[in-house]
Amino acid sequence: AHGGIYRYNSKAYIDRHFDEAKAALNHDIDALGFYRLLKPAVASIACGHTTALLPLDIKASLDHELLLPFDVKLLQGRVFIFRDFSEGNRLAGQEIVSINGMEIRSIVQTLSKAMHGDGNIPSMRAIEVGRAFKELLFTMLGMRQQFKVVLRNPKSKSLTQHQIVGQELHSLKQASLKQYPQDQDSTNFLKLSFFDDAKIAYLKIDNFIVKEENKDGATILKESFETIRDKNAATLIIDVRDNGGGEDALGKLLFSYLIDTPFSYYDALTIKTDHYTMDQYAEEPIRLKAKWLSARSDGQFDFLKHPNLGIQQPSLPAFKGRVLILINGGSYSTSSEFLTQVHAHHRATFIGEESGGAYYGNTSGHHMLLTLPNTKVRLVVPLMTYQLSTKQSHAADRGVMPDYPVQRTIEDYIQGRDPEWRLALKLAHQSNTKTLKH
């Protein structure tokens, strides 16, 4: 059923991981123990839309587990405390060396192997492990209640040991919401602002999901680019950092304002079969209309009903100035498709870190959510392989690489500094100054 199960790793490689998990089932095991075995095996598929989820009862009880009271950042393979919710509240900025006697390198390796992500892209997995670090310590390693943590001071390099008492996850979420509202995920689709006497337009796109009742995404984009035209901006900075995707068509529509000739966005959408046999385990049965499908010679099917298929037209008013795009490992799915097309058409300069989605497309679209009958562990299985239209030569298992790599420090995060944005602003100002001189 999975649309691209062997897209990045061979059958032998994936089978080996599932065989290892099966071999470990040589004794009685509870649902959480089974989840710990299954999750790395599923992650070996290397698909960012494919994952094992906790049973619903364990997921609900997780809110009351006593977990490590830190928010962390993974930076170049090292783990730093970003927010400290422990009793002393004085450890932010420290580097974690070990937890309960386990070296942090081993912890990160174990958690990363269990994290879903496209291909061989480390930036996305680093972000996802960092976001869910405290939860993963429990669900994958069983660490809870009491934590013996060894820390390194980044400046003095001295080591200190701390006995940290776990706190309920629910309380930690509430503390984060109250103390650090700036850390919370934004639900905005788009925000437009201007700098340098309106010579620089800044388009912040947090996701491709429109929640406004009185406007659709197409209208919002059109009005935004009309405003950019009316203010005669010379440089456009587009920020899709931590944009995990949304509506496919909005990514294509955004790209259509950056180009002035017809273009192809998707080459093909394919599925393995027109009939699925796992309905008894699925939350909702999958039913694809026959008129949407066209049989292929290899036994698969082309999916025909999608607005991003076929020749696409540019949108007006097209922006013809310089484009700078801020990216990171959280730029995924719909935003990754947009980034591939911009990159393949040489339409922008990229700043930040490698994007989170594989260059030639992902496996997503229609999904099956399966619940395993004995453990109630759930599996998310995407059915559709997306093939982006591009002749650009690129590693299939990697994302878009930045022209200007920027690596943040833990102090950047704590102090709220944004070096990617500052660099983009500097480049935009330099570009505008050169234009004026000419």
Residue locations for each model-derived region?
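Flexible, low-complexity junctional segments that flank or bridge functional domains
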Residues: 1-236, 240-271, 279-283, 359, ...
